[in-house]
Amino acid sequence: MALCQRVTIFFSCAVAAGLLAAPAYAQDVSKLTSIVDWSLYTDSEKPHAFCFLTSTPKLSTPANAGSDGARVYISAWPKEGVKAEPSVRLGFATKKGSEITAAIGAQSFTLFADKERAYVADATSELKLVEAMRKGSKLAVTATDPSGTSVTDTYSLAGLGQAMQELQSTCF
């Protein structure tokens, strides 16, 4: 399945889980557990078509930046063999042509924007980002809003290693 199709399905399900503002269809997605700062959700299919982990920022700067609804996701698509696909909901559309970065310690990754969302460009970079997240303590996502303001959302990575294990055992 193409990335665009998976993303469309994923965000439809995230809406259903009440993670994004829109009418909910709670029977499609359910929260299984929370592990420190991460929550695990799955669809209702057996075997699962998808599962995802999500977390909200612990800090947003500037405080009035308007990144309302920001979230980081790690999605799994068992039928397509996708075990850990990272993405970010920024909570605002980015300034055209601006760069989005995800930083964990000294490592930095460039993301691309699609409206209010950001993705890693290729599978190799996805794996490197997820591995850095598993080993790190915080993730800082920086993007530029349409007015030119640089916005940074900082996420805790506490519990992600255990949450990833739970994601894999639940979804695969």
Name what the model sees in each region:
Residues 15-16, 25:
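Terminal low-complexity, poorly structured segments
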Residues 25-172:
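A generic "folded-domain core" signal
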